[in-house]
Design a protein with these regions (language model features):
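Conserved loop-alpha-helix segment in the C-terminal half of the alpha/beta-hydrolase fold
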Residues: 200-234, 240
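Active-site loop/oxyanion-hole signature of alpha/beta-hydrolase fold enzymes
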Residues: 34, 43-87, 248
Length: 257
C-alpha cells in the first residue's frame, strides 16, 4: 500500500486528501499543511514510485491511471474514510478526476490546481521528443527541460526548483514508467472533456500557465458544477508560487460544504 501521512483535527472534521503530480511527492504541499489542518483532517499520499512510496512497485512493468487511482482508493478504504475532498496539482488532477469516475461516493469535492485537461500541440511535440530521447539522455535532463518550458519565467524559479528537487529522488526506471503513462493519457483526457463533471469542482490556474489554462477555461464554461479562479502573474505550480492566494481560495471553496 502507498505511504501516507495524516494530520487529524478531530473525529468530526471533514477529510481533505492531497494528490501530487508526476515527479513530485506529498512534500509539494508543505505550504498548505498549516492552513488546512486548522479546520480539516488532512491526508497526504505519496503516489507509487514517489516520496516514501519509492521502490514499492519495482516488479510492475507498466502503469495505468486506473491502477494508480485504485492505489489511492485503497489507502482511504484502509483508513475507513468514506468521503473526502480532494486537492490535486498537475497530473494529480487527472488522478482525482479518475477517482470521481471510479468511486464517486468517495469524492465530496475536487480542487484542481494547474489542471491538465488537454495537451496542446507544443506539449504533445515535447512529449514525443522526450520519448525519443529518453533512451540516450539522463532522465533528469529531460525533466529539467520540461520544468523550464512549463515554468519559463524568472519568477517561476522557486516553483521550478521544488519541481526539480523532488524529481531528483525518482529512479530512472520509475521516471520512464510515468513518462510512458503520460504519453498515453490523451484518450482519458478526451473522455473527461466530453463528460459533465460529476462533483463540485474548483479549478485554480496560474494566469501564466500557457500550456493548460485555455482548455480549462473552455471546460468550465460548459460545466455548471465547475468554477475557475485564475491567479494573475502565476505559473503552473500555483500552490507553491502563490501559496497564500491558493490557500485562501481553496478554504473559501471548502467552507461551502
Amino acid at each position: 500500500m502507498l505511504k501516507y501521512k495524516i494530520y487529524k483535527k478531530s473525529i468530526d472534521a471533514q477529510w481533505v486528501t492531497f494528490i501530487h503530480g508526476a515527479g513530485g511527492s506529498s512534500k509539494i504541499w508543505f505550504k498548505q499543511i498549516k492552513a488546512f489542518t486548522a479546520n480539516y483532517n488532512v491526508l497526504l499520499i505519496d503516489l507509487r514510485g514517489h516520496g516514501e512510496s519509492k521502490g514499492m512497485f519495482d516488479t510492475v512493468k507498466q502503469y495505468s491511471f486506473r491502477c494508480i487511482s485504485e492505489d489511492v482508493i485503497d489507502v482511504l478504504d484502509f483508513l475507513k474514510i468514506k468521503e473526502s475532498h480532494f486537492v490535486g496539482i498537475s497530473l494529480g488532477t487527472i488522478i482525482i478526476r479518475n477517482i470521481a469516475e471510479i468511486q464517486p461516493s468517495l469524492v465530496k469535492s475536487m480542487i484542481m490546481a494547474g489542471a491538465i485537461l488537454k495537451f496542446n500541440l507544443m506539449s504533445q511535440i515535447l512529449m514525443r521528443v522526450g520519448y525519443i530521447l529518453h533512451r540516450v539522455l539522463p532522465h533528469m535532463a529531460i525533466y529539467k527541460s520540461f520544468a523550464l518550458i512549463i515554468l519559463p519565467r524568472r519568477k517561476h524559479k522557486s516553483s521550478r526548483n521544488v519541481f526539480v528537487n523532488e524529481a531528483k529522488k525518482l529512479f530512472r526506471k520509475e521516471f520512464i514508467r510515468w513518462y510512458k503513462l503520460t504519453s498515453d493519457v490523451n484518450p482519458l483526457l478526451r473522455s473527461f472533456r466530453r463528460k459533465k463533471i460529476n462533483k463540485p469542482s474548483l479549478f485554480i490556474m496560474g494566469g501564466e500557465d500557457y500550456m493548460f489554462l485555455s482548455a480549462v477555461e473552455l471546460f468550465v464554461q460548459r460545466n455548471f458544477l465547475a468554477q475557475l479562479n485564475v491567479i494573475p502573474d502565476c505559473g503552473h505550480i500555483v500552490n507553491v508560487q502563490a501559496a497564500d492566494h491558493f490557500n485562501r481560495i481553496s478554504l473559501g471553496f471548502l467552507s461551502e460544504f
